[in-house]
Amino acid sequence: MQELIKRTLPQDDALNQAIVNELRSQNWAGFLNYSQVQQLCHNFELTPLKLAMHLLPLAASYSHTAISHFNVGAIAIGEQGDFYFGANQEFANSAIQQTIHAEQSAISHAWLRNERRISDMVVNYTPCGHCRQFMNELHGAEKISIHLPHSQNNPLHSYLPDAFGPKDLDIAAHLLADENHDLIADHQDDLINQAILAANQSHCPYSNSPHGIAILFKNGDMVTGRYAENAAFNPSLPALQTALNFAYLNDKKLSDIERIVMAEKALKLSHKTMAETLLSTLTSVELEYYSL
């Protein structure tokens, strides 16, 4: 990742050098907190939006696009000014529906870093209908601004007029809000507990079928993923995708996976088979399934 980032941001530029130094200090995680953003903006006389635009090729470098070879980068800006990178993640030899779109990637990245509200989405290509619908699940969706290289400060709902969303199904819960499904993590195996805790934070008001993923890497690091459901159903993002996306955006290698656990309360639906199918194309490590 280090060399790819350096190729994306030519190092004969002082701003690019400063950005690379920040990323190096955090092991190439695709994230800049508010203080880092403010310092870069101050040192190089930029607005946060101009900095985000400059960072889009960098965000896109986290893509995995074995099918389309079309890299999309996105930056979700949290309400306190943190920058969460996102990139499209494709999976060859699996169903195309397993794909993670760049805006989904940035939002789920923010979610797993415990962001509670997105104020702006900066992206290098116009959001597709799938992503517009996914963003409409967010709290305050009507106030989110979309920024493109050729057009800034566009309300999300200008891309999604007469929008369908949670309120149409009498759902008050929104993606990124605090969630609690009363799932108890009291197993002797800590990785199973981490998967249960992730499931407990799932956003699944339509199926009430939470599930979570916990991945253990050979160096002892853990990554978790939560299920993000959508009022339109199909734009929903399974927990395996949110976990893999977080791993990619934090420079984890799938070849270093040691164990993967899914914890699921399968009331109306189950993601077990879908997860097993995707995993079989990525690793020889088998999914450990824990029913809640």
From Swiss-Prot:
Positions annotated to bind substrate: N88, Q89, E90
Active site positions: E103 (proton donor)
MF (Gene Ontology): cytidine deaminase activity; identical protein binding; zinc ion binding
E.C. designation(s): 3.5.4.5
Keywords: Hydrolase, Metal-binding, Zinc
Matching CDD domains: cytidine_deaminase (cd01283)
Leading EC class: hydrolase
GO BP: cytidine deamination
Residues that bind Zn(2+): H101, C128, C131
Domain spans labelled CMP/dCMP-type deaminase: 47-167, 186-292
Catalysis: reaction(s): cytidine + H2O + H(+) = uridine + NH4(+); 2'-deoxycytidine + H2O + H(+) = 2'-deoxyuridine + NH4(+)
Cofactor binding notes: Binds 1 zinc ion.
One GO CC term on file: cytosol
Listed cofactors: Zn(2+)
Keyword Protein transport carried by entry: no
HAMAP family: Cyt_deam
Family statement drawn from the similarity comment of this UniProt entry: Belongs to the cytidine and deoxycytidylate deaminase family.
Function noted in UniProt: This enzyme scavenges exogenous and endogenous cytidine and 2'-deoxycytidine for UMP synthesis.
Oligomer status and interactors: Homodimer.
NCBIfam families: cyt_deam_dimer, PRK09027.1
Name of the protein this chain belongs to: Cytidine deaminase
Source organism (scientific name): Haemophilus influenzae (strain PittEE)
